[in-house]
Structures are given as C-alpha cells and as structure tokens.
Regions:
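Short polar/acidic secondary-structure junctions
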Residues: 175-176, 188-190
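SH3/SH3-like beta-barrel fold
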Residues: 183-187
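Generic beta-strand structural signal
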Residues: 177-178, 234
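N-terminal Rossmann-like dinucleotide/flavin-binding domain of flavoprotein oxidoreductases
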Residues: 14-64, 149-176, 182
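Rossmann-like dinucleotide/flavin-binding elements
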Residues: 1-12, 47-60, 66-150, 189-200, ...
C-alpha cells in the first residue's frame, strides 16, 4: 500500500511524544522512536506534519482506505468513576487537566491533584507539580496511589518517590465539589466532608475521544464512491481511550486485517481469523 500519514501537530508520536517528557517516563519514547525509524526506511510512506485535516480535505485526498487515529483528550469536568456528571463547583477554582500541564500551562501555589484515573498519570503529574515548586496534595478515592500500577509492581516505588518529593498523599478520599478556597473532600467510606485549601486543582479524570472527523466522514458516506473511498475506520484512543499498548495494537491490527475485508462491513463479534476447535466425536 501507498501510505500518507497526516499529523495535526508539529511532531509525530501522538500522546507518547508528550508523555515521554513527564518525570520518569522518558523510556516510553522508544515506542515512538522505533516506529518513526521504521517508517523512515519505507519509500511508500509520505509524512505530513502540521496537517490537521477536515472532512473536505480527506475526501479530496484520493485514498481508498481511511484510518482515523485522532486520539483523545482529558476531560475538564471531572467525569470519571466518582462523578458520572460534571463535578459541582467547576469554575470556582482554577482547574487544569493533564493536557494543560503537558502543554506547559502549570498551576502554582497550593495544588490539589485529584486522581480518579488510578493509572500512572495522577502520580506523575503530582511529582511534576512538586518539582515545579508547588505545595502538592494528591487526593484519590483509591486505597493506593496510582492503584493500577500494583499490576506492574511499580506502585510502591511511585508512592515512595512522591513522598520523597514532599507530596502529601490523601487516600480513600474523593473530591465532591470545588470551592473558591479549595476542594471539598469526602471519605470514600463514610462520606465525611472536609475542606482542603488550595489555589488550583488538577483534574485527572477520564478521557474523551476526538472523533469529530470520523463522524463527519460517516455523515458524508454518500460521497465516498465519488472520492474513491472504500472504507473509513476509527481506531486507538479515538475509538476507546486506553493504555498506549492498546493504541499500538489497534494500529497493528488495522494493517493486519486490511486485506481480510473485515473493515468493509460490520462483522460484529465474528472473528476475523480462523481457529481450530477440538471436539470429542463418537468413533
């Protein structure tokens, strides 16, 4: 296949290009470096940085198969596990998302990092704020800092690293609302309330897919034939935000299945590959 890779930003790598710059995550850059090197060896791949495409541009591109991998963004309304609707008090206290911090927009003074994601991002951003001179309190409804990292045997090291950085850790505690003078915290078990004074809050909640382009293309499906388009597929974080490994697998899977016809129709839960099923038979 002849491939065109259009990147909306100035550099390739997606979220890895940003997250590799966070404390302790520089090694993750190898995920990006390896693939960029491999792509650079192939004459049939054209790369276009700084090329955010709209529906019209995609239709005019002239490619038969369109893979939309537009990623996701961190929610700014606090919706995650504790809050299924927007957190009360938004706008009363300066609030930041992980995207803000990775773009260089940092809080100052007393900062509460509210981690309702429970993977690695909350702990990493708490350390980042502490290194920037903030007085940091990490609040999480979980019983452990960066709870998911117990699966990778990193949780203890993360807790120790945060404690050594001067981060105050508050476990089993959520944030029920934002106030002008800080956050209203609540016990995950008793719902007892107290105020943690702060000048800003970093909301590490859930992520929302950047799928506007995909839905715009689907709405113009009647124009696909004239544009020479056979298939349009949404993959990676744009389809369902998840770990970097899942996004990497999604790209690999898309390429593997491109010749199978699976993208040309909705296969539902049908497997796109054959497998041998052993059963007992009467001789």
């Amino acid at each position: 296949y002849d491939v065109a890779l259009a990147e909306a930003g100035d550099s390739f790598g997606g979220r890895v290009a940003r997250e590799r710059l966070l404390p302790g995550l520089s090694a993750w850059g190898r995920v990006m470096d390896y693939r960029l090197y491999q792509i650079g060896q192939r004459p049939n791949v054209q790369m276009y940085p700084g090329s955010e495409l709209g529906v019209e541009e995609v239709l005019e591109f002239g490619f038969q198969n369109i893979c939309v991998a537009t990623g996701s963004r961190w929610r700014a309304d606090g919706v995650a596990r504790q809050h299924v609707v927007a957190m009360p008090g938004l706008g009363r206290l300066p609030s930041f998302t992980p995207d803000d911090l990775m773009a260089g927009r940092m809080p100052s003074g007393r900062v509460v990092v509210y981690d309702d994601d429970h993977y690695y991002m909350g702990g990493v951003l708490a350390e980042m704020c502490a290194k920037a001179g903030c007085d940091v309190t990490l609040v999480t409804p979980a019983a452990f800092v960066s709870d998911w990292t117990r699966n990778t045997l990193e949780q203890g090291a993360i807790h120790r690293r945060l404690a050594e950085a001067g981060v105050q850790i508050v476990l089993n505690t959520g944030v029920s609302a934002l106030r002008a003078d800080g956050v209203e915290a609540n016990c995950a078990y008793t719902d007892a309330r107290r105020v943690i004074e702060a000048d800003a809050v970093v909301l590490v909640a859930s992520r929302a897919s950047n799928d506007t382009l995909y839905h715009g293309l689907m709405a113009r499906s009647s124009d696909w034939a004239d544009a020479g388009i056979r298939s349009v597929r949404l993959i990676g974080d744009a389809a369902a935000p998840g770990p970097i490994a899942w996004a990497t697998y999604a790209g690999h899977r898309y390429a593997r299945e491109l010749d199978t016809g699976v993208w040309g129709e909705d296969w539902g839960d049908t497997l796109s590959f054959r497998r041998e099923i052993t059963e007992l038979a009467v001789d």
